[in-house]
């Protein structure tokens, strides 16, 4: 269920319902608009038959030409998540599936096996970003390869394919750390000595750029370690080791997102 002004009437609110799965699979969306104080159904739209089979979340955003759109996160095969984009076309007065540049195959482009990864405005620019797990982000060493995955978030909000944001997701602590695009494919991440976190290094692992660790709340900050966030009864700390263009303590503080929060 999602309440949003999709039809652009400004003085009313529209309602989008994801209806229960039918025997054909996929998801059926129902668009209702407020008429004289009552929600009335104006459209149903069937999506994703054979590709996904249940809605996990709906998100509203504004894309190119200020057009209203929806991002739907949907279950695929029960153990994976994909996303689809639906536009509201003011001329026809209806919702339509949209495959913008870079998203000709949504199920392949947005597939992720960490099903807790839902779409969101990850960079704070007002558009909805879709996460995708990628294989070319860098080298994840054992044992951190069990908890970390490289992500590329894209918003597909304009004709050129939208903005993208590269980084690493820690599934154990449920946070995303954005990294400079120049690190894409050129870094190694390995565990730190105390097994409390991980080190971002150059491709060969010979130069450490920074360390991320999770420690008790009463662990004091120091000249080296600064608190980035509080995670339950623990704190996330960061330490810069070797300078890297575009990566700084201020950058880490501004671009680390706890995904358990809105």
Predicted regions: what is each one?
Residues 1-8, 53-63, 114-124:
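Beta-propeller blade termini
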Residues 1-13, 63, 151-177:
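Surface-exposed beta-loop interaction hotspot
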Residues 8-19, 62-74, 122-134:
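Acidic/hydrophobic-patterned starts of short beta strands in beta-sheet-rich repeat architectures
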Residues 23-33, 77-90, 136-157:
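Structural motif
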Residues 40-47, 96-102, 161-166, 180:
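Beta-propeller fold detector
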Residues 97-120:
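Conserved blade-ending motifs and adjacent loop-strand segments that build the rim/top face
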Residues 180-228:
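Secretory pathway targeting signatures of secreted, lumenal, and periplasmic proteins
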Residues 239-262:
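Surface-exposed amphipathic alpha-helical segments
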